[in-house]
Structure formats: C-alpha cells, structure tokens
Regions:
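Sequence/structural signature of beta-propeller domains
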Residues: 1-195
Length: 195
C-alpha cells in the first residue's frame, strides 16, 4: 500500500493505492468525499497535512491512515492551547472500502513556540497497528524556538465515537469521544538529536 497527501493548494486529491510486489496497480481505495479539497478552501485536507501514516493490522484485516491535522471543516491546526482534531480512517483491507472513522486530537504546540507569523507545527505523522482497535501513534512538532519534538503514544479506539457520518466536527467536538491516548515516550528524554 502507498499513500499520498495530495496537494490541497492545487486541488490534487490524496490517495491510497495497493501495488503488487512487481509494481502493478492492484486497486485504488475510495477516499470519503469529505476528505477531498474543494476549490473554495472550505473543506477537505489541508496542504501537506493529510495521509502521512499508513499501517496494516497484524492479521491484514484492516488498513489505517489518518490526517496529520484537522480537515478544514473540522477545526484549526494546533495552537499553544489546543491540539488539532484529526480523523483516523479504518479500511477493510480486502475490499478497500473505508469502514470506520475516529477522532484523534494532537497535542498542542510545544511550550515556548511562537506561532505568530512563523513556521510551527505539530501533527500525527505515523501509526502502527497493534490490533483492530489499538495503535501506536507518533506526533512530531516543530518551531524555530523549540526545534523538533517527537512523542510516541498508545491509542485505543474502543471507547472512541465513530465519526464517519459527521461532515464537520467544528461545532460538535465537545460531543464526540476521541480515541484514548497514553504517552509512552517523549523522545526528548533520550537526549539525542531529533530531526
């Protein structure tokens, strides 16, 4: 499986495709309409903040991906006070059809970051499936003031509400139970250079 973030600025849709070991395209997975950017910039993925993660469950039953940050209609990118509401997509790996979606909220920007007019980010950049409902998530943040920070979490979807029927989360975030998250490791504690 290969994923692409697309290019929201040029209205190039994200995609997920399955290829054989010799490079032949086997199938293109359906991307739900609400993820596709429109020409007004009012819905869909944000540029360079889409499907960076991709993982299969050990039994190869499900394929997971997630947006790196919120869809335009779901909320904002992270700030110093709040995280960004991402969507985790769970596909049936055999049929290639999306079968569930869950809310995942990133951590806020690192303390000390100055987001005013500067490059700052924090996003959900990778997932590793443990089973059908548990995953490892990796969040990577950057600011000129703090440099790169990376945190590893264990997440559970078991008590998270399914959100695939919700076109927008912006006004409903307080009503939706997100994936549960537990910090496993802040890589800053390892005292090694992060990039």
């Amino acid at each position: 499986f290969v994923s692409s973030e697309g290019d929201a600025d040029r209205q190039i849709n994200p995609f997920i495709k399955e290829f054989s070991l010799d490079g032949k395209l086997l199938k293109t997975l359906a991307i739900p309409e609400l993820f596709l950017p429109d020409d007004k910039g009012t819905k869909g993925i944000r540029n360079n903040l889409s499907f960076e993660s991709l993982t299969l469950t050990p039994d190869r039953k499900y394929l997971f991906t997630a947006t790196e940050n919120a869809l335009v209609q779901d909320g904002a990118v992270p700030s110093l006070e709040t995280g960004s509401p991402c969507r985790i997509l769970r596909y049936d790996a055999v049929s290639g059809n999306p079968e569930a979606s869950f809310l995942y909220i990133t951590e806020p920007l690192p303390a000390g970051a100055n987001p005013v007019g500067k490059l700052t980010s924090n996003g959900l950049v990778d997932l590793v499936a443990i089973d059908d409902n548990r995953l490892l998530s990796l969040e990577r943040a950057f600011s000129l003031e703090t440099g790169v920070t990376v945190k590893l979490f264990e997440i559970s979807l078991e008590k998270g509400d399914r959100i695939e029927a919700l076109e927008s989360l912006k006004s409903r975030l307080s009503e939706v139970s997100p994936a549960q998250k537990r910090l496993l490791l802040d890589l800053e504690t390892l005292k090694i250079p992060l990039d």
